[in-house]
Amino acid sequence: MYIKILNNHLLAFFLIISIVFFGCQQQGSETAETNKSTRTAIGDNAVYGGVLCVSDEESFRSIFPGKIEDATSAKIAGQIHDGLVAFNPKDLTIVPCIAKDWSVSEDQTNYTFELRSNVFFHDDECFENGKGRKVTAQDFKYSFELLCSNKFEVSYNMFIDKIAGAKEFKAGETESLVGISVVNDSTITIKLKEPHTSFIYNLAMPNSSVIAKEAYEKYG
């Protein structure tokens, strides 16, 4: 019961942070529109590279999905990582992200996600020839297994009590997370132990973002 209450509080906490963040983002867009003439005078050519400095009241602790526990880290990670779904910045409803579509079984325990075919990891030396490859369903399975493993002792885990077989996987009783199945490169299914209305919102959190196995093995 404590874990469920904690998860609900954390979900509400991140939703509040999302409202504040997206509100600031919208305000920033309005300011940018006001200064459009100034930008035009300077030039319309996009500038790539360089360093962007952003002021914040607190320092972030980690932007690795499996270690995010604070609001500042979540805010930064949300601008770097992507998951299956995302929050609509206007009303915080769930919208597609890397998953272009999904369906839920009648008993609300089986989720099937269809991935977009045009999503790639950024170029990096961890990949073959330094070229970022396409994101596949196997990458999401790897990411969720990493999140549910015993490698990260965070104060909470929003999937351990929800995804079928997660507790057994964390305890080392199984070699893979049986609640997650890769149908093909673009299709993944997630089976829950019981219905959870908050699950789809959990998938929109930065913690649920996809990472590449090559990157984790190289950089940790």
Predicted region positions:
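Bacterial N-terminal signal peptides that target proteins for export
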Residues: 2-11
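Bacterial signal peptide processing site
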Residues: 25-28
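Immediate post-signal peptide segment of exported/extracytoplasmic ligand-binding proteins
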Residues: 42-53
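N-terminal lobe/hinge region of extracytoplasmic solute-binding protein
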Residues: 55-106
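A structural "hinge/loop" feature
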Residues: 58-74, 98, 125-129, 156, ...
